[in-house]
């Protein structure tokens, strides 16, 4: 075994040990006591001023923010007047994610318990006309069956109950968490593991948050390389989009900070590797995927693209190596450095961006384009997943970009026998040369794609709720990445000097914690439950008063929590 191979074996062993069962988020022994001690709720004297600086908008505070939602629901549970609305809210959410065979029974239970005046939790705040329409309508497994009721319930809760919440101890507890969330964070909070890959401006490595033990991927953008190659705009756009979009089909940004040499984006770690690696490297004798596996990934990519396009974001770099698998075998799209956000009133953009072989004809011709370019790239990606080669060149064929451009613009695509008629037809609709005729995002949704016969066996509701079992589940003992020596190294960048404007850009970039992923981390790793301790008499907890109590180090399954 040469030194390079030995280095990979050692690095892989350390990485696998750190991530534990797979995500490394529930191993108390992996937590650093020094940083663990810093995760403590502050006294109210330090955080009450946040009341004037945070958004007090109901949806953001009580629905979108995970800790905010939990605390608001805990508050509602303490007042019997609000319990019917709380339980209806929770039961409708449960109905929306339930298996189809369970939904009729759950629907009947909702009708009997909350809409019948004789029900134990009758919701008298609901408009009786709306209730009558729901009762008269079809019951069973219909999507959106109870959405009018849910909207009315949240509207009710956003009035009097919300105002009561803002004056409660539960809201003060929320302010404590927001103070903790806002504390500075930097590279010293993270432990680096092996390099997973390389991008245009730096490496991506596995890392572990020292306080919680949660594993992440850290994308390091070399400052000098960014400046020399004029990469500031792409870096800040990627960071802003990742922080803005929260989707189970797009990698999430948890932290952003700077080091002496790099700008760092700490994101969802995708332990299953990228789709390109699986196409060509997992089974080299039989590259490519069976069609059902390719269809499953395509469906998840469609949902991710829809979430981007609904926020007016053109991705521009969809390809197999930017589609990553998580622990369970579900995918997320990543690397949004080439994405562009359309301004209000702007329907198209212009500019040469993307990867040769994946760029749409209108983009290659220098024309204005819209979201449709991403669906052309989806067609190329689906084709490659099935055929183990691109649609415009043979596997291993070296083609000059000029020739490749000509093929994309004018030549028809040929399909090998591996394609069923349905997958061929779907690909052809995506690889349509005319963007006006191309299948894609229409009227704010991807429903036209979902309706295609290719997805007849996909339950889109369950897919988007994360309830389907993927066709391939990664092995927790395997590192799905190239050997370290095959990743390659960057050459040293010389002759770059930073000025005041550079420093200001770096400081703007290093914004610290991202609210929703940070709160999810606190919940998933058990810290929310461990620190959210209340007195049995309902009086103000000691931590709010600033009274320190000697506590044991929290664990993911601690019994300290009274309400979680």
Curated annotation (Swiss-Prot):
Its EC number(s): 2.7.11.14
Tissue and organ distribution:
Detected in retina (at protein level). Retina-specific. Expressed in rod and cone photoreceptor cells.
Q: How is it modified after translation?
A: Autophosphorylated, Ser-21 is a minor site of autophosphorylation compared to Ser-491 and Thr-492. Phosphorylation at Ser-21 is regulated by light and activated by cAMP. Farnesylation is required for full activity.
Tree of life domain: Eukaryota
Q: Which reaction(s) does the protein catalyse, per the Swiss-Prot or TrEMBL entry?
A: L-threonyl-[rhodopsin] + ATP = O-phospho-L-threonyl-[rhodopsin] + ADP + H(+); L-seryl-[rhodopsin] + ATP = O-phospho-L-seryl-[rhodopsin] + ADP + H(+)
Localisation per UniProt entry: Membrane; Cell projection, Cilium, Photoreceptor outer segment
- Chain residues carrying a lipid of type S-farnesyl cysteine: 561
Q: Where in the numbering of this chain does the RGS domain appear?
A: 58-175
Q: Residue ranges of the Protein kinase domain?
A: 190-455
What are the Cysteine methyl ester sites (modified residues) in this protein?
A: 561
| Database matches in Gene3D superfamilies | Phosphorylase Kinase, domain 1 (3.30.200.20), Regulator of G-protein Signalling 4, domain 2 (1.10.167.10), Transferase(Phosphotransferase) domain 1 (1.10.510.10)
Give an example GO biological process: G protein-coupled opsin signaling pathway
Identify the stretch(es) annotated as N-terminal: 1-189
Q: Where is the active site?
A: 317 (proton acceptor)
Instruction: Please state which protein family the record places this protein in.
Output: Belongs to the protein kinase superfamily. AGC Ser/Thr protein kinase family. GPRK subfamily.
Subunit structure, per the record?
Interacts (via N-terminus) with RCVRN (via C-terminus); the interaction is Ca(2+)-dependent. Interacts (when prenylated) with PDE6D; this promotes release from membranes. May form a complex composed of RHO, GRK1 and RCVRN in a Ca(2+)-dependent manner; RCVRN prevents the interaction between GRK1 and RHO.
Query: What is the protein named?
Result: Rhodopsin kinase GRK1
Which organism does this sequence originate in?
Answer: Rattus norvegicus (Rat)
Taxonomy of origin reads:
Eukaryota, Metazoa, Chordata, Craniata, Vertebrata
């Amino acid at each position: 075994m040469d030194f390079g191979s030995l280095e990979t074996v050692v690095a892989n062993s350390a990485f696998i040990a750190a991530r534990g069962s797979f995500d490394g988020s529930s191993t108390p022994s992996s937590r650093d006591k020094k940083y663990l001690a810093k995760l403590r709720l502050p006294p109210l004297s330090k955080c009450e001023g946040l009341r004037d600086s945070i958004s007090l908008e109901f949806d953001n505070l009580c629905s979108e923010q995970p800790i905010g939602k939990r605390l608001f629901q805990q508050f509602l549970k303490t007042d019997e007047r609000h319990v019917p609305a709380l339980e209806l809210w929770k039961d409708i959410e449960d109905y929306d994610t339930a298996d189809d065979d369970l939904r009729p029974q759950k629907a009947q239970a909702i009708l009997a318990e909350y809409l019948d005046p004789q029900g134990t939790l009758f919701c008298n705040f609901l408009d009786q006309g709306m209730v009558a329409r729901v009762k008269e309508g079809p019951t069973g497994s219909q999507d959106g069956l109870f959405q009018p009721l849910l909207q009315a319930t949240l509207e009710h809760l956003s009035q009097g109950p919300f105002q009561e919440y803002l004056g409660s101890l539960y809201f003060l507890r929320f302010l404590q968490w927001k103070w903790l969330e806002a504390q500075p964070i930097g590279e010293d909070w993270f432990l680096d593991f092996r390099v997973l890959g390389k991008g245009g401006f730096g490496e991506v490595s596995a890392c572990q948050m020292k306080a919680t033990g949660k594993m992440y991927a850290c994308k390091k953008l070399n400052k000098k390389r960014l400046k020399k190659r004029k990469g500031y705009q792409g870096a800040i756009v990627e960071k802003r989009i990742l922080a803005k979009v929260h989707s189970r089909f797009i990698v999430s940004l948890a932290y952003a900070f700077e080091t002496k040499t790099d700008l760092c984006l700490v994101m969802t770690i995708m332990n299953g590797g990228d789709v390109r690696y699986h196409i060509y490297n997992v089974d080299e004798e039989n590259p490519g995927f069976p069609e059902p596996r390719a269809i499953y990934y395509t469906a998840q990519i469609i949902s991710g693209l829809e979430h981007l396009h609904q926020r007016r974001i053109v991705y521009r770099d969809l390809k197999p190596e930017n589609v990553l698998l998580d622990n369970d075998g579900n995918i997320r799209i990543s690397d949004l450095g080439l994405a562009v956000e359309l301004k209000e009133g702007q329907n198209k953009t212009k500019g040469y961006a993307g990867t040769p072989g994946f760029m749409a004809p209108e983009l290659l011709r220098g024309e204005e384009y819209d979201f449709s370019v991403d669906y052309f790239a989806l067609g190329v990606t689906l084709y490659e997943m099935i055929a183990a080669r691109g649609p415009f060149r043979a596997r291993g064929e070296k083609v000059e970009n000029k020739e490749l451009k000509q093929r994309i613009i004018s030549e028809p695509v040929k399909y090998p026998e591996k394609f069923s008629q349905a997958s061929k037809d779907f690909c052809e609709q995506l690889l349509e040369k005319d963007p006006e005729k191309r299948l894609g995002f229409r009227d704010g949704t991807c429903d036209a794609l979902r309706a295609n016969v290719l997805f007849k066996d996909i339950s889109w509701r369950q897919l988007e709720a994360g309830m389907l079992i993927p066709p391939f589940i990664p092995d927790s003992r395997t590192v799905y990445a190239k050997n370290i020596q095959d990743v390659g190294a960057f050459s040293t960048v010389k002759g770059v000097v930073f000025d005041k404007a550079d420093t200001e850009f770096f400081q703007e970039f290093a914004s610290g914690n991202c609210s929703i992923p940070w709160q999810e981390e606190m919940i998933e790793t058990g810290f929310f439950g461990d620190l959210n301790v209340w007195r049995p008499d309902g009086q103000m907890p000691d931590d709010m008063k600033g009274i320190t109590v000697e506590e044991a180090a929290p664990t993911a399954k601690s019994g300290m929590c009274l309400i979680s």
